[in-house]
């Protein structure tokens, strides 16, 4: 009986320590999010150049070469890669 009480007390202590640690980290992370949000709105207000937008699109497209809507243009059907794009 005493062992289970000790285990319960240890678990409660760990939960309390975890909650204190998460409360101390939360304001720091919230501050980082507000900084990022301010940078995003400043970039949107300034207006991005079209070349920067195209570079972002190209960079994203190169990471995902799989075609979602495969048109069957390859020799192997349903391979997932589109030869025309």
Swiss-Prot record:
Signal peptide: 1-22
PANTHER family noted in UniProt: HEPCIDIN (PTHR16877:SF0)
Keywords: Antibiotic, Antimicrobial, Cleavage on pair of basic residues, Disulfide bond, Hormone, Secreted, Signal
Source organism: Canis lupus familiaris
GO BP: defense response to bacterium; intracellular iron ion homeostasis; negative regulation of iron ion transmembrane transport
UniProt entry tagged with the keyword Ligase: no
Location in or out of the cell: Secreted
The protein's name: Hepcidin
Disulphide linkage map: 67-83, 70-73, 71-79, 74-82
Function as written in the Swiss-Prot or TrEMBL entry: Liver-produced hormone that constitutes the main circulating regulator of iron absorption and distribution across tissues. Acts by promoting endocytosis and degradation of ferroportin/SLC40A1, leading to the retention of iron in iron-exporting cells and decreased flow of iron into plasma. Controls the major flows of iron into plasma: absorption of dietary iron in the intestine, recycling of iron by macrophages, which phagocytose old erythrocytes and other cells, and mobilization of stored iron from hepatocytes. Has strong antimicrobial activity against E.coli ML35P N.cinerea and weaker against S.epidermidis, S.aureus and group b streptococcus bacteria. Active against the fungus C.albicans. No activity against P.aeruginosa.
GO MF annotation terms: hormone activity
Origin: domain of life: Eukaryota
Major localisation: secreted
Propeptide residue range(s): 23-54
Family: Belongs to the hepcidin family.
